[in-house]
C-alpha cells in the first residue's frame, strides 16, 4: 500500500489535531458535573457513558495523521485504565495540556529531547510528592467515598466498600447483570469453581437441589476414573473413618460412577463426584490450588502417584463442601497456612510477569480464591442501555476502590496535582530547555481542575488561583460549589489513579515532542462500481 509522509512541524501538528479531537470529546465527562457521551453501535441500542476509555475506543478519524495522533492518546487512556481502573479522562486532559505547551516551545526553537528530559524529571518529582502526601485508607467509609465518586452513586460506593470489607483487597469482586431492579451483593465463602455434581443422585438436600458434605475428605485426581477397582482401596479407607468424600477428577465414568451412586442411595457411604475445573495447563494449576488449600495432593502419574495405591494422607479436608448443579464451594480448607501463602506469592509473581490481559484476569481469579474470597454485585435497571452504563460504572468503581486500598488516597478534584506540584517545583533545580520542560508540567497540572471548573460552569482561572491560596488538602468541591477540606468531605482520588494519569500522559507527550516524521497509509479513494451489475458485464445477457 502507498504511504504518505509528513515532516517536522506538519507532522507534529497533524498528530496534535487528532489528539485534540479525541480529548475534546472525552473531557466533557470530567468531574461531578461532567456530561455523558452517546456512542452509536452497529447493532443494538447506543451506549451512554462518561468513561473516558470507552469513548476513546470508539473514535476513528478519517485523516491519516489525525488518526495516528488519536491512537496515541487512546493508549494513554487504555494504560491508565488497565493500571488503576479510572483516571482515563484526567490522563487525556493532562496529555492534551502537555502536548499543547510542549509543541509551542518546540515551534519556538527549544530542543525536544531536553524538553522531554525536563518533563520526565518534573513528573518524577510530582509523583514523589503525591506518594508522600497519600493517606492510607483506614475505614469502610473512605473506600465508599472513593468508589462513590468513580461511580457517581453513593449506593454503589457503599456496596463496593461492603464487598471489599468482606473479601479483602486480594478478593475478586465481579459485576453481573440482574433481571431485577436495584443492586444486590452476594458473597461466597471459601473457594468456588464452576463445576457441579456429575449426577443428580448425589443430591442430599432435595429442596435446594444441592449436596452438602460436612467435614469431608477430598480426593483430587488429574485423570479420568473409569475402573471401579482403582477406587476400591481408597473408598474402603474413607468408609472406615465414617467420613464423606468429594471426588474431583477429569471425569468419573459409568462403572465407577454407578458404584458411588449405589452406595449413596443405599445410605452406606455419602459422596459426590465433580469434574475438574478448566482445561489443559489451567486445569492442572487449579487442581494444585485446591490441593494446597485443602492440605491434599493431586493424584497424578506425572508425580508417581496412582489412585490404586492412594492412602488417606493424600486426601484433602475441609469444614464443609456445597455442590450444586453448576458449581462447587469448598469452605475452610485444611491446608497449611505457610504453603497457601507461598502459592499466593507464586501467583502474584506470575501476574506481574504476564503480558496477556486474559491470563492476568484468570490468575487474579485464582489468587482471590486462595487468598480472599469472591463477591458478586448484581445490578439491574429499567432499560438495557441504562443497565450497560451502570454495569460499566460499577466495574470502574471496583477497580478504583482497590487502587485506593493499595496505595492510599489524596484530595480529589484535581487539587492533589496542583498542591504536589507546588512542593515539587520548590526543590527542582534545572537549567535551559530542561527547566522549560519542567515548566510545561507546571502549567499542565492545572488542566484537570480547570476542566472540572468549566464543566461545573465556573471560571477556570479564578478557581485555580483560589485553590493555590488554600491550605493543603482544601479545594473546590465541584458538586456543591464550596471550597472545603476535600478528604473530610469525602472528595478523594486513589493516588495510584492520579499518579498513573500523570505518568502515562507525560510518556505520550514525550513521544509527540520528539516526533520528526510521520509515515501513514495513503487514504484510498472509493472507486465507483462499474455500471450494469449482471453477469454479462452490462450487455443485458447478449
From Swiss-Prot:
GO biological process: protein refolding
Magnesium keyword on record: no
Keyword terms: ATP-binding, Chaperone, Cytoplasm, Isomerase, Nucleotide-binding
Pfam families xref list: Cpn60_TCP1
Location relative to the cell: Cytoplasm
GO cellular component terms, semicolon-separated: cytoplasm
The enzyme's E.C. designation: 5.6.1.7
Catalytic reactions on record: ATP + H2O + a folded polypeptide = ADP + phosphate + an unfolded polypeptide
GO molecular function: ATP binding; ATP-dependent protein folding chaperone; isomerase activity; unfolded protein binding
Residues that coordinate or bind ATP: 29-32, 86-90, 413, 477-479, 493
Superkingdom per UniProt: Bacteria
Function summary: Together with its co-chaperonin GroES, plays an essential role in assisting protein folding. The GroEL-GroES system forms a nano-cage that allows encapsulation of the non-native substrate proteins and provides a physical environment optimized to promote and accelerate protein folding.
Family: Belongs to the chaperonin (HSP60) family.
Quaternary data: Forms a cylinder of 14 subunits composed of two heptameric rings stacked back-to-back. Interacts with the co-chaperonin GroES.
PANTHER family assigned to the protein according to its UniProt record, in alphabetical order: 60 KDA HEAT SHOCK PROTEIN, MITOCHONDRIAL (PTHR45633)
Protein name: Chaperonin GroEL 1
Natural source organism: Renibacterium salmoninarum (strain ATCC 33209 / DSM 20767 / JCM 11484 / NBRC 15589 / NCIMB 2235)
Amino acid at each position: 500500500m502507498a504511504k504518505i509522509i509528513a515532516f517536522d512541524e506538519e507532522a507534529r501538528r497533524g498528530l496534535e489535531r487528532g489528539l485534540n479531537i479525541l480529548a475534546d470529546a472525552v473531557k466533557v465527562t470530567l468531574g461531578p458535573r461532567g456530561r455523558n457521551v452517546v456512542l452509536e453501535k452497529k447493532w443494538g441500542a447506543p451506549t451512554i457513558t462518561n468513561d473516558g476509555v470507552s469513548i476513546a475506543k470508539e473514535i476513528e478519524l478519517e485523516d491519516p495523521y489525525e488518526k495516528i495522533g488519536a491512537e496515541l492518546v487512546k493508549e494513554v487512556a487504555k494504560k491508565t485504565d488497565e493500571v488503576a481502573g479510572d483516571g482515563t479522562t484526567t490522563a487525556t486532559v493532562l496529555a492534551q495540556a502537555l502536548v499543547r505547551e510542549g509543541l509551542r516551545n518546540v515551534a519556538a526553537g527549544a530542543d525536544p529531547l531536553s524538553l522531554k528530559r525536563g518533563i520526565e524529571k518534573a513528573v518524577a518529582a510530582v509523583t514523589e510528592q503525591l506518594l508522600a502526601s497519600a493517606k492510607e485508607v483506614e475505614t469502610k467509609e473512605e473506600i465508599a467515598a472513593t468508589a462513590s465518586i468513580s461511580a457517581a452513586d453513593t449506593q454503589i460506593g457503599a456496596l463496593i466498600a461492603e464487598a471489599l470489607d468482606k473479601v479483602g483487597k486480594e478478593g475478586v469482586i465481579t459485576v453481573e447483570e440482574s433481571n431485577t431492579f436495584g443492586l444486590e451483593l452476594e458473597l461466597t465463602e471459601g473457594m468456588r469453581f464452576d463445576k457441579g455434581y456429575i449426577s443428580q443422585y448425589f443430591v442430599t438436600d432435595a429442596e435446594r437441589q444441592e449436596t452438602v458434605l460436612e467435614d469431608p475428605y477430598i480426593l483430587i485426581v488429574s485423570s479420568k476414573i473409569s475402573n471401579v477397582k482403582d477406587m476400591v482401596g481408597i473408598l474402603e479407607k474413607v468408609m472406615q473413618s465414617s467420613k464423606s468424600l468429594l471426588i474431583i477428577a477429569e471425569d468419573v465414568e459409568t462403572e465407577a460412577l454407578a458404584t458411588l451412586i449405589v452406595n449413596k442411595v443405599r445410605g452406606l457411604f455419602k459422596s459426590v463426584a465433580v469434574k475438574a475445573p478448566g482445561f489443559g495447563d489451567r486445569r492442572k494449576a487449579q487442581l494444585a490450588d485446591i490441593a494446597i488449600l485443602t492440605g491434599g495432593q493431586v493424584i497424578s502419574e506425572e508425580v508417581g502417584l496412582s489412585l490404586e495405591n492412594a492412602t488417606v494422607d493424600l486426601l484433602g479436608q475441609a469444614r464443609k463442601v456445597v455442590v450444586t448443579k453448576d458449581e462447587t464451594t469448598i469452605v475452610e480448607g485444611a491446608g497449611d497456612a505457610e504453603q497457601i501463602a507461598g502459592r499466593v506469592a507464586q501467583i502474584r509473581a506470575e501476574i506481574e510477569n504476564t503480558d496477556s490481559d486474559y491470563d492476568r484476569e484468570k490468575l487474579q481469579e485464582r489468587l482471590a480464591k486462595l487468598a480472599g474470597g469472591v463477591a458478586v454485585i448484581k445490578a439491574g435497571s429499567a432499560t438495557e442501555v441504562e443497565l450497560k452504563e451502570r454495569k460499566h460504572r460499577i466495574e470502574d468503581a471496583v477497580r478504583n476502590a482497590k487502587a485506593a486500598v493499595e496505595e492510599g488516597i489524596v484530595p480529589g478534584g484535581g487539587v492533589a496535582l496542583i498542591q504536589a506540584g507546588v512542593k515539587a517545583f520548590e526543590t527542582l533545580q534545572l537549567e535551559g530547555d530542561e527547566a522549560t520542560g519542567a515548566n510545561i508540567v507546571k502549567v499542565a497540572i492545572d488542566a484537570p481542575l480547570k476542566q472540572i471548573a468549566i464543566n461545573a460552569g465556573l471560571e477556570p482561572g479564578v478557581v485555580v488561583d483560589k485553590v493555590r491560596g488554600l491550605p493543603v488538602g482544601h479545594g473546590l468541591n465541584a458538586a456543591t460549589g464550596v471550597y472545603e477540606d476535600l478528604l473530610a468531605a469525602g472528595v478523594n482520588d486513589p493516588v495510584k489513579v492520579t499518579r498513573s494519569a500523570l505518568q502515562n500522559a507525560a510518556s505520550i507527550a514525550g513521544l509527540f515532542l520528539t516526533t520528526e516524521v510521520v509515515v501513514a497509509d495513503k487514504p484510498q479513494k472509493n472507486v465507483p462500481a462499474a455500471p450494469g451489475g449482471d453477469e454479462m458485464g452490462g450487455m443485458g445477457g447478449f
